[in-house]
Amino acid sequence: MTYCLALKVNRGLVFASDSRTNAGVDYVATYSKMRRYCWPGERVCVLMTSGSLATSQAVMNAINRDLNDPDAEFSLRHGKQLYEVAQYIGKLSQAEQTLHEKAMEKSNASAESNFILGGQIAGQAAEIFHIYPQGNFISASEDTPYLQIGETKYGKPILDRIIAKTTTLEDAARCAMVSLDSTIRSNISVGPPIELAMYQDDSLDEPFHHTYTLNSPMYKSMKKQWTDGLHRAFEQLPRFDWEKVKADEPAGE
């Protein structure tokens, strides 16, 4: 299992992912789920994956093959709109799944992968897309300016409470970190290092990128402050009516 998310706010895009792969309790490994492609002044693409690692790697290999082939029919550099790039990735994923479909069915395994694509092409607005295993895709909406893939449920509540179009890029990044940390605490199949990338609208340059381990000072401080803050907020919640009555009763002799 994995967890990746992308947020779209007025000033830009935020991407975050864990780095754990899990093929059972006896085989847990670390693998980056985020790829960044940048042609300064022209376009920026960030791609994250969840699901079948074999399918994800095959799609990444096909992307790199087409980028290195001047005669390729399409590549990340060809699309005039980012949704055309999303269509291209969806087709690559579908082709890879179809190639191994019968063998996977016999072993009762799944070759499905989900992708999040985000970035910007010169002259166009920055966008994020969730590309499904079936090859179709959706974009983030005004009301829900984020996308998630993988183990999504534990990290969703904080996004719903905090993220809006007007959220600053830095606050969106902090929220993404908390969302990932909440998931890591609740699901053993999601784990650090955490990769974080931030892209500023219209910069058309390499996104800021950093990797945080369990021992990274910023991550350790964030975890502690968030946990302490939750405890303080919980302790300050309103009392039930019967607690108030009990508190007002005179102490017995």
Residue ranges and their predicted role:
Residues M1-E253:
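N-terminal nucleophile
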